[in-house]
Regions:
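Glycine-/proline-rich flexible loop or hinge segments
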Residues: 39-44, 69-75
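Radical SAM enzyme [4Fe-4S]-AdoMet core and its adjacent flexible, acidic
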Residues: 42-44, 133-148, 152-251, 264, ...
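Short loop/turn segments at strand-loop or loop-helix junctions that form parts
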Residues: 20, 32-34, 75, 125-130, ...
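Residue-level recognition of short loop/turn positions
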Residues: 27, 105, 260-261
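Canonical Radical SAM [4Fe-4S] cluster-binding loop centered on the CxxxCxxC motif
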Residues: 2-54
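Radical SAM/AdoMet-radical enzyme domain recognition
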Residues: 53-73, 83-173, 189-192
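Active-site beta->alpha N-cap acidic-glycine motif
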Residues: 78
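Flexible mid-to-C-terminal extensions adjoining Fe-S/redox cofactors in radical SAM and related proteins
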Residues: 1-4, 12, 245-281
Length: 281
């Protein structure tokens, strides 16, 4: 059985995450927020103006002092585009000299299209299936977005697009077709084939880790690794770069801010939150 082994040899801080806390519009079974639901689900800052987020200015000043330019708005147990003051936050962050990117499931893209096109950082889309039944098993939603229309619509001169596909028990037989489909979009910079991560649910999620590694071994036989990116293999498939991303085994590094005021210098999200959430009170 495969295991999740954390690589604690990290690079210097490359970026920082703003981890929103609140209720999501999807229900992904592997969501990292489900590792510690008793701690995270009591918070909801989706409708709280960022000027009222505890320790937010401290976090931004820390990023400035460290020379960190790239920030990502993401959801720890929610989605970035659910934030009520999303467009205002973009202007505030980027007017301070940062480049803001987002991580999103895409379901609210049309509501925030103008804001997304203003982003100077990356737009990270999560696309785990193109099949309604499979998507419902993974994300708790059967509706598949019109990516043929939306992907070109969100691309602008200032942002770039990365698509993350989390390989799991439900979509394992669809991965090659998904990658082939996504590879036709010139607007997509690269595809990230992500492995599930967990700190507290190995008993239920190690099955997915093993599925990932089995698929990777098959892919590696047919497609050559041409480079690595922070310890992750880069393989060209159907003309598009696919980065095989085992999050905790890479050497990437980041600071993490949570909208309840917790600040963590630990790249490992759950571990960092558990070690720091009381200190930020």
């Amino acid at each position: 059985m495969e295991k999740i082994n954390k690589n604690r040899n990290r690079e210097e801080y490359m970026f920082a995450n703003i981890n929103l806390l609140g209720k999501c519009n999807a229900n992904c079974y592997f969501c990292l927020g489900k590792d510690i639901p008793n701690l995270l689900n009591i918070h909801n800052q989706l409708h709280v103006h960022f000027s009222e987020w505890k320790n937010f200015e401290k976090f931004l000043k820390d990023c400035e002092s460290r020379g960190i330019k790239r920030l990502y708005l993401t959801g720890q147990n929610t989605d970035a585009l659910l934030y009520e003051y999303f467009d205002e936050l973009i202007d505030y962050i980027q007017d301070r000299g940062f480049e803001l990117g987002i991580r999103t499931n895409g379901y609210l893209i049309e509501k925030h299209l103008s804001g997304i096109r203003k982003l100077k950082g990356g737009v990270g889309l999560s696309i785990h299936s193109l099949d309604s039944e499979t998507n419902n098993k993974i994300m708790g939603r059967p509706d598949i977005l019109d990516w043929e229309r939306l992907i070109p619509a969100i691309k602008s001169d200032t942002n770039h697009i990365r698509v993350a596909v989390v390989i799991n028990r439900y979509n394992k037989d669809q991965i090659i077709d998904i990658i082939k489909y996504l590879s036709k979009f010139d607007e997509i910079d690269y595809i990230q084939a992500r492995r599930i991560s967990t700190d507290t649910r190995e008993d239920t999620l190690l099955e997915d880790v093993e599925i990932y590694e089995n698929l990777y071994r098959e892919v590696e036989k047919k497609f050559s690794v041409y480079d690595t990116f922070y310890n992750a293999q880069r393989i060209r498939m159907f003309g598009k770069e696919v980065c095989w991303w085992r999050t905790v085994e890479t050497t990437a590094n980041s600071i993490n801010y949570f909208t309840d005021g917790t600040i963590s210098g630990n790249y490992f999200i759950v571990e960092g939150y558990l070690n720091n959430y009381k200190r930020s009170e």
